Amino acid sequence: ARVEAVVKRVQAGKLGFIALHSAHWAKPFVRLMQERAKADAVAALPEAERATAQWQYLNEKPYRVIPKKGAPATPHVQKVGTVWRLTLPQCVFPVYRADGAPSHVATLQPTHPLAAGLPAKWDIPQTEMYGEPFWVPAPDSVIFEEKWDKGEHFRSGALWKVGQGDVFYFRPGHETYPIYRQAENLKVIENAVRWMGAEAARR
C-alpha cells in the first residue's frame, strides 16, 4: 500500500522520485517504470484503438532475475489475437562487474538543472560497473553517460515523466566504494533534490 501511495503521488505531480544505483529494483522505482511502460504502450497505438484496447501485463514481479546477454529486451509489446500483451520492464541489465574499475562520466545536457555546477566530464576512481542495455522504458532525457575502459557504457543519469511527476535514476553507487563522498556525485543528488522538489511544489 505504501508503494502504491508513492506511485500515485508521483503520477499526480506532488512528489519527485530519485533512485540511486541498486534502487533499480526498489519497488517504487519498478512500479513507476511499469506505469511509464503502460503509458508508452498505449501512446504507440493508433488513437482510435486506445480507449478500447485490451491489455495483458506480464512480468509484474521482475526482482532478482538477471537476463542473459542477447535476450529480448523489455518492455515489449506483442498483439496476441485481440489482446495486446505487454511484458513489463525487467529494470536491470545483463552485465555488471564489482571490480572497482574507474568510470568516466560525461555531462550530455549541460544546460539542464540537474547538471548545474558540474563539469563536462569527471572520473569516479572506483565503482561497480553496470552495462547497457538497461531494461527500462526509453528515458525522456539522458543527462549523464558513464563509460569504462573495457568498453561498457551506461545511461547513468536518466529522467522520465511518469504521469505529472519526475523520476530520476543515477547509477553511481555501491557501498564498497566512497561514491557519495565525491563532490560531483553529491552535486548531482543535490541538484536533483532541489529541482524536483521545486517542480513538485510548483504544481
Region roles according to the model:
Residues 11-12, 22, 34, 194-198:
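Sec-exported extracytoplasmic/periplasmic mature domains
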Residues 140-141, 147-156, 161-203:
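Extracellular ligand-binding/catalytic regions of CAZymes and related secreted enzymes
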Residues 9, 132-135, 159-161:
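A general structural signal for short secondary-structure junctions and capping/turn motifs
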Residues 3-5, 128-131, 154-156:
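A generic local structural motif
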